[in-house]
Amino acid sequence: MTQTKVIGESVKRTDRSFVKAYANDYAKAITKNYFDYHMNQLTRFGHPNPDYANEQIAEIENGSANLMKFEVREGRKYYKVVQSEFETWNGSKYYQQYRDSSVHSFVDKETGEVFKPASWNRPAKHVRYDMRDERQLNYLLDSRNVDWAGGYLYMR
């Protein structure tokens, strides 16, 4: 009986570590989607301010651009995927730092279920995706599918 409980706890810890890794990969996919969107906006149809666009592209190419990114914050029950923006207003206490600006989604630490946020602290009621389903997991980890603005999280 005790041996079974130990094995069960080991499996739970393994599942949690996979969910954490998938949540981080999911955040990277959303960040890549934003990067692709930003580059597309700068290059596609001719930017209304070409000097600004060229300056932005040069910063991206030399690695000094501070683009919006998505990061995972660990909570008691959920991983919170947070949109972080670089603060450029010099009156802010976060000047020249990334700061969390909004919640993109929640990922259940136990199951890998993905939720749209209802508020900063709480997910919406209905599960939108499940990382235990291989098809849905592959969908979430592909940057072409996950929109940085979160449109894919609305009920289908």
Regions found by a protein language model. Give the residues of each.
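Exposed beta-strand-loop-beta-strand "reactive/processing" segments of non-cytosolic proteins
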Residues: 58-105
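Polar low-complexity intrinsically disordered regions enriched in Ser/Thr and small residues
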Residues: 11, 49, 66, 78, ...
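A short, surface-exposed interaction/processing loop segment used at functional sites
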Residues: 111-143
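Negatively charged, low-complexity tracts enriched in Asp/Glu with abundant Ser/Thr
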Residues: 3-71
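Cysteine/selenocysteine-centered motifs that mediate thiol-based redox chemistry or coordinate metal-sulfur cofactors
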Residues: 145-156
